[in-house]
Every structure is written in structure tokens, then in C-alpha cells.
Amino acid sequence: MTKQTEYKRKPEWLKIKLNTNENYTGLKKMMRSKNLHTVCEEAKCPNIHECWAVRKTATFMILGAVCTRACRFCAVKTGLPTELDLQEPERVADSVVQMGLKHVVITAVARDDLKDGGAAVFAETVRAVRRKNPFTSIEVLPSDMGGVEENLKMLMDAKPDILNHNIETVRRLSDRVRARAKYDRSLEFLRRAKEMQPDIPTKSSIMVGLGETREDLIEAMDDLRANNVDILTLGQYLQPSKKHLPVLKYYPPAEFAELKEIALSKGFSHCEAGPLVRSSYHADEQVRSAKEKTAEAK
């Protein structure tokens, strides 16, 4: 057996129990009927069955289903995006009502074709959800919106409950993994978000298994903490197709536990770490934990 073949074989701890009960099928039908997209489907998230069938949660993906970037880890389609759908914010808000969500995550494809990076529609989606669901906490997961401060301000002025922006990988691998996004630009984005709205928790995520070292990961944690990021998620990279970057290492659960302890020792208010953890995984629990610790610190 070659080393490359060995890398492609998933270990036991990554095997997922599929659950397609009425919650799952009902949620899928609702998304289709409202012409909405979820990152759960578009990015081939391994937790879709747990979230849709058991937890009845979903991460809405706005601004279309075609991304202007072509990150080498991501399964979302790339190309020329469609025109903006200005009715999308209301449909998302109505879906949150229909689902009875206590916490909603709203993400988007990168829209480098737009001057504001999609910030106006993103902000309006937050406001629409807030109007119709005043007791639902709202987490936003935008791209870097070109690193333009005015675009970020537009989104932060809508007052989401949590701002999530992923650095995705360590500094040493960033240019290879996501060539059109920049590591330092993402850190700056997170720093500015905290400066604009100090009471809104910030969050970021790192994939592992792309060739990073323990030292690389610790450096990334330090970089995030230096920019006042509150919450960290760590999960296993899984290759979506043969066209994407290969998995170079499968981290066992015990190693994720070690990384979580390191992250918490760095001062993160919450760290979710595990083979199947993704940025939005158990997001409601993450934001609740962060807010409780912020309140305790005051």
C-alpha cells in the first residue's frame, strides 16, 4: 500500500451515521421551495444529517451558490455569480420563523465582483431575521469582503450576535490553500470587527490535516488571540474530490483534545475541537458559552 493510498482511507472515528428522518426531508423541501442555499449541502458538510435531522439547525448561505474564489479545500462551486436576489433576506427570515430556530448562522460565498463584497445584502439579512425573530441569536460568517473597512462596518452596524471569519489554515500554508484570501488580511478583518463592536464575540476556525505542524497551529492560535478572537473551532480537513488538496494526516480524537487544552490555555473563551467539528458545529452552544464568560469578566 502506498503512502498516498493510506492517507485516503478514513479512520473509524470519521464514520458517520446517516439519519434522514422527517426533520431532514422537511428541511430540505423547505430550502428548495424558498430557493435558498445552505453551506451544509454546498460544502458537503459531514454533520448535515446530525444538524438537519437531530438538532434541526442549518447554516444559510446567501448571495447565491457560486463563489468568485477557488480555494483548494472548498466544495462550493466557483465561477461567475448570478445577480443579487434582493428578496433573499426576507426568505431567510421567514425560514428561521418556520424552523423555530433559537440560533441561526448566516454565511455567504465570496462576491469579489461586488464593490461592497455583498455587505449590504448581508446586513439586510441580519436585520430581517432580527425583525421577525427578535429572540433568535444571529451569527454571521462572511468572507473578508475584500478587506474594505467600510464593508465590514456595514455588517457590524447590523449588530449580529457573533462575528465569525475563518483563517482556515496556518500562516505557512495559507497561500497554497486559499490563494485569493490572505492570512494577515483575515486577522485584520477580525481585529477591526472587535474594535468596531467590542461586545460582539469574534470567532475563527482552522482545518487540520493539510501538512501543518503543532508549532504552526500554536502560532495561529497566538495570532488569533493577538487580534482578540474569542472562540476557536478546530476540525479535520476532508478532501471533497480528487481535484482538491489531499489529506496528509488524520488527527485522532485524543490529539484534538490536546489542541483544545492548548487553545483554552491561550485565553480563548471557548474552543470546539474534534474530527467532525466545523465552524458552525454546535454554534448555539459556542455563543452561549462565550457570552457567559464575557459577562463573568465584567
UniProtKB/Swiss-Prot annotation:
It catalyses: [[Fe-S] cluster scaffold protein carrying a second [4Fe-4S](2+) cluster] + N(6)-octanoyl-L-lysyl-[protein] + 2 oxidized [2Fe-2S]-[ferredoxin] + 2 S-adenosyl-L-methionine + 4 H(+) = [[Fe-S] cluster scaffold protein] + N(6)-[(R)-dihydrolipoyl]-L-lysyl-[protein] + 4 Fe(3+) + 2 hydrogen sulfide + 2 5'-deoxyadenosine + 2 L-methionine + 2 reduced [2Fe-2S]-[ferredoxin]. PROSITE patterns: RADICAL_SAM. It holds the Pfam family LIAS_N. GO terms for molecular function: 4 iron, 4 sulfur cluster binding; lipoate synthase activity; metal ion binding. [4Fe-4S] cluster 1 binds at C40, C45, C51, S280. Binds 2 [4Fe-4S] clusters per subunit. One cluster is coordinated with 3 cysteines and an exchangeable S-adenosyl-L-methionine. It is found in: Cytoplasm. Signal peptide: none annotated. Residues 53-269 form the Radical SAM core domain. Its main location: cytoplasm. [4Fe-4S] cluster 2 binds at C67, C71, C74. The keyword Metal-binding applies. Its cofactor is [4Fe-4S] cluster. CDD domains: Radical_SAM. HAMAP family: Lipoyl_synth (MF_00206). This is Lipoyl synthase.
